Structures are given as C-alpha cells and as structure tokens.
Amino acid sequence: MAGTRTSRRAVPVAVLASIVLIAALAGCDSYFFYPSKDHFPNPALDCVAREDVFVRTPDGVRLHGWVLRPKGEPLGTILFLHGNAENVSTHVNSVVWLALAGYRVVLVDYRGYGKSEGKATMAGVHADALAAIDSVFAMDGVDKDRVAVLGQSLGGAVAIYAVANSPHKDRIRALVVDSAFSGYREIAREKVGEISVLKLFRSPLSRLVTDRYSPSLWIGRVAPVPIFIVHGDADRVVPPAHGERLYALAAEPKMLCIVPGAGHIQAFASPAMRARVLRFLADALSTKRHLGTELP
C-alpha cells in the first residue's frame, strides 16, 4: 500500500514539474535571469577605488553600475558583463584583480538587477549590453583605442552579441568570454534533459526559447576583434563543449584555453590563468596584433 501511495503522489508531482517548466520556458526570461535587488557587503571592494556609474538605455531604463579605478594611469578600460544571478556587488569578485593589475573596469547591472531599473527580459538585457558599450565610449578620460569587453557565463553570451552588433566594434580591441554557453536553446535543451520526467520532451520544449541572441549565431561576426575563449574542463553548469563549439565557430583572430580542474566561472581563480588573460589584453590593447592561436 505504501508503494501505491507513493506512485499516486509521484504522478501529480511530475505533472506539476512539467507545467512549471513549460511555463518557465514559455516565458524564457524567467528561466535565464535570477537577479537580486539587494547589494551584499563585499570586503574585496576595500582594496580598490570605485564610483557609481549610470547608463540610460534607448528605451529609457536607467542602469546602475560601478567603475573600478586602478592606481595611476589605466592600461585600458574593460567593460564587464556578469552572469545571470545576483548583481555587481557579488560579481565584482571576478574582476577586482583586473583593477589591481592596472585596468579601469566598468561593471553595469542589467535591468532588474541591483539598483538598475526595470525587469530583466531577453531583449532588454541584450539592449543593456549595447548601451553599456556606448556609455564606455562616451566616458571622459577613457582612451577609446584601449577598450575591451569581458563576459562571464550569461554575460559571455550577451557580450558576443553586443560586440558583434555594436557601432563601436571597430574600436573594441579585445573580447574575453568565460564559461559561456553556445546557444540559449541548446543550454535549455540540456537542462530540460536533466529532469527525468521531461527528458523525452527536451527538444520540443527547448523550442519555446528564442535563439535570436544565441552566441553561436553571432560569434562569427565578432571579427576582427580578437577573442579569447576560456572554459573550465570541470564546468558542470555549462559543459566545456560549449566553449569548444564557440571557438570552432569564431573567426580569426581567436584563442581558446580549456582550464584543467576549473568549474563554472572559476578559471580566473588561477594566477596562471590571470597571467594569460593579462598577456592577451596587453597584446590586443597595445599592438593590436592578431593572435590566431590556441593555448594549451
């Protein structure tokens, strides 16, 4: 009898899970975006100077972010586009080291995140990234010939679209992409497949997700901006096959580093990996030399 009761309960649970996921995919924005409005205390900020920055998007949304300032004259300016959860107050941990290495770092929260207005949507977040690039090129004191873009996870996917479509592309000197998925529909299909009751339906369900902004469609248009793709080989959130796929689709100049033992957005915890990124940025922002090589 106990087994019968369990099976009877399992059916509505499975049905409920299906309904919830279908609703999430049908409104795919809620499936990809998990913002937090609250800023969290972060001791990492004690070692770097910062100030608030505000960006107005073409549709009138005011975005909030930070500028991290290095000591002395900046080596260049890096726009950082973060992942799908929380806000700049936590994601800043991923880029403080760049400010300490001498770069001005601009972090902007997408709409609905942190102190930014509005609600996160697929179209809105990608528009926000384009507006953030515009704002960097409009900032006083920024050397417009020494600008790079760095995106992590969702931010990597967004960065590929934004750089490919920015009117400033001819002046963007480098793009670094860490732990990005190759397509919105593809990653949705993989995640649906991890739910046993929906595994057989992963392909039709994933079609509810738009592929309009998928990086696999846009990465070929990033050129001639040099692109460095970084991915951990222990990434269980976005498997490294996504990074390899993006590298295969990218045009020269391009570089790839699959980092042994690194999980999702953990590659930059390695001093050796930071050094490689700094070499890439120094080369791209100073000599503008094409680097079409793959790192081991």
Give residue ranges: language-model regions:
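Conserved alpha/beta-hydrolase "acid-adjacent" motif
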Residues: 236-242
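The serine-hydrolase catalytic nucleophile loop
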Residues: 84-97, 110
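Alpha/beta-hydrolase active-site loop
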Residues: 120-140
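Hydrolase active-site cap/lid region
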Residues: 161-223, 266-271
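Conserved alpha/beta-hydrolase
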Residues: 97-117
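Alpha/beta-hydrolase fold nucleophile elbow
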Residues: 142-153
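An N-terminal hydrophobic leader/cap segment in hydrolases
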Residues: 23-56, 64, 291
